């Protein structure tokens, strides 16, 4: 039974939403928004209108981009919360600008966010009105971005890109300029934080004309919305530069201090790089010169070692040659000595025979002498 009750309730909500989209007057939902059919919560509370209907702030702001009447009773929409009413008025102004296009466009130059094109401004508008208009633009965009990317929209529904519409008419006059990041990095030192706060809080005073259009993002939104340019202002027009006196009004002392600090930092970095480069070149020169001297010393030592090695090798070769030459000479000497030994024996025998012959001759002579003496 409970499931059937929930089914009938959801079907009733869907039927109410379908009839509401078609334009019929329906009863308001008790605890849910009659536009998106989602319940109210602490992160996304309800916003009460003057006709006592409750909606999500984002839903009613998106509805007011198309219509100025309450979707439930078709009365003129006004919110009881003064802050929400200011946002609603800003959205209605943007809707009127889109429905009633004009050719007047004013260029606003911000030192941090770049150049912005503000359309539909009077000719004799002063700087205070320009600042108020810009604050309204950025506040409306921030509220829409936060509500669109809130917790209640995660995983519940997805809208096609064909149903998207323009949110606010703030365009950049520089097509190639990059938009500021949604989450700027926090400076590390207090001085850098002061400088960034000073630059972001400068007044918005510079004026000009032109209509180059590109997507830009508000810095105050944690989830910024992209802006689609209008087709009526697609033709380019010349850009008139503002006078120097009007540009000097945007905090000259802060700009000068910021530029001087940047120049000092750049000079310090450049001197550091120059010193490091000079040190590196000196080290390389010292290394090259030391390598040349060491190579010269090494060459002399190598030459000495090579000459000593050549001398030792030549000596060894000479020794080997002398040894090889001495071996055949000793062999010939031994052969000659062996050949001469029998000759010496023969000579010895001959000498012994000669001695015997001489002894025999002496004996014969003595006998002959004795014989002659006896006769």
Swiss-Prot record:
PROSITE patterns in alphabetical order: ZF_RING_2
Region of interest called Disordered, as start-end residue ranges on this chain: 146-165, 172-262, 318-375
Entry superkingdom: Eukaryota
Reactions mediated catalytically: S-ubiquitinyl-[E2 ubiquitin-conjugating enzyme]-L-cysteine + [acceptor protein]-L-lysine = [E2 ubiquitin-conjugating enzyme]-L-cysteine + N(6)-ubiquitinyl-[acceptor protein]-L-lysine
Pathway: Protein modification; protein ubiquitination
Composition bias, Basic residues: 146-159
Role summary: E3 ubiquitin-protein ligase involved in the positive regulation of the gametogenesis progression. Required for the degradation of KRP6, a cyclin-dependent kinase inhibitor which accumulates during meiosis and blocks the progression of subsequent mitoses during gametophytes development. Functions in association with RHF1A.
Record CDD domains: RING-H2_RHF2A (cd23122)
Record SMART domains: RING
Gene: RHF2A
Gene3D superfamilies cross-referenced by the UniProt entry: Zinc/RING finger domain, C3HC4 (zinc finger) (3.30.40.10)
EC number: 2.3.2.27
Name of the molecule in the record: E3 ubiquitin-protein ligase RHF2A
PANTHER family found in the cross-reference section: E3 UBIQUITIN-PROTEIN LIGASE RHF2A, ZINC FINGER, RING/FYVE/PHD-TYPE
Compositionally biased tracts (Polar residues): 211-245, 327-336
Ranges of biased composition (kind: Pro residues): 178-188
Start-end of Basic and acidic residues biased regions: 337-365
Keyword Metal-binding in record: yes
Zinc finger region(s), RING-type: 33-74
Gene Ontology BP term (one): regulation of cell cycle
InterPro entries hit by this protein: Znf_RING, Znf_RING/FYVE/PHD
Pfam families in the cross-refs: zf-RING_2 (PF13639)
MF annotations from Gene Ontology: transferase activity; zinc ion binding
Record keywords, A-Z: Metal-binding, Transferase, Ubl conjugation pathway, Zinc, Zinc-finger
